[in-house]
Amino acid sequence: MMLHAQHMPGQPGTSSLVFLHGFSGDCREWQPVGEQFHGCSRLYIDLPGHGGSAAIPVGGFADVIRLLRATLISYNILKFWLVGYSLGGRVAMMAACQGIPGLCGLVVEGGHPGLQNEQARAERRLSDGRWAERFRHEPLTEVFHDWYQQPVFASLTAQQRQALTALRSQNNGETLAAMLEATSLAVQPDLREALNALAFPFYYLCGERDSKFRALAQEVAATCHVIRNAGHNAHRENPAGVVDSLAQILRL
């Protein structure tokens, strides 16, 4: 089994860019940024529970990484950079720490390296469980209205919140809930030590108004790019700034 994806071919002999979206996003999320790198092959993946992969069930990160590897093989992608936002960034970090073959470099935007104690994991398990129940049983417009009131999204304007709520409400609540539980921070290991031992380039992007993830970026051995005029979802709030950072990283 493989994940649904959109593939855009580039020039032969270049490393591919593999884009992983955030929770409740889909393969379209990164395209405004990725299409500025038309010389590279680009693969935009729908993670399990999302978009064209909504019906694909997973029990945890191991299943997600296995599906990611199968998808890369199916497109004959042998050398690649992983570029992931939030949930996609956590999947990318997990894949990197597990030694996914062919990985040339890692770019994470606003991805959490992992909780560091059992109390924090227990609290997160309860919180994600409550959200999952809401996704399963309540209208998605109501759930996402509240979702975007969380402190991490404080930099969004009312108009941006409204647009995101309308966009994300097109999802399937049941499959979102299942993916939220399967990949919760409560079940993700603390990746700091493994990330600090990576043998390939690791870059971290965060919005200048995202104080939580700017602090987390200092806890991993990554080169940090701060995106101006942006909060947690920097590639949506300032795509040109993220394009500039990626161009520097990839030396394009």
From Swiss-Prot:
InterPro entries: AB_hydrolase_1, AB_hydrolase_fold, SHCHC_synthase_MenH. It is an enzyme of class 4 (lyase). It comes from Salmonella dublin (strain CT_02021853). This is 2-succinyl-6-hydroxy-2,4-cyclohexadiene-1-carboxylate synthase. Keywords: Lyase, Menaquinone biosynthesis. One of its GO terms (molecular function) is 2-succinyl-6-hydroxy-2,4-cyclohexadiene-1-carboxylate synthase activity. Pathway: Quinol/quinone metabolism; 1,4-dihydroxy-2-naphthoate biosynthesis; 1,4-dihydroxy-2-naphthoate from chorismate: step 3/7; Quinol/quinone metabolism; menaquinone biosynthesis. Its EC number is 4.2.99.20. Monomer.
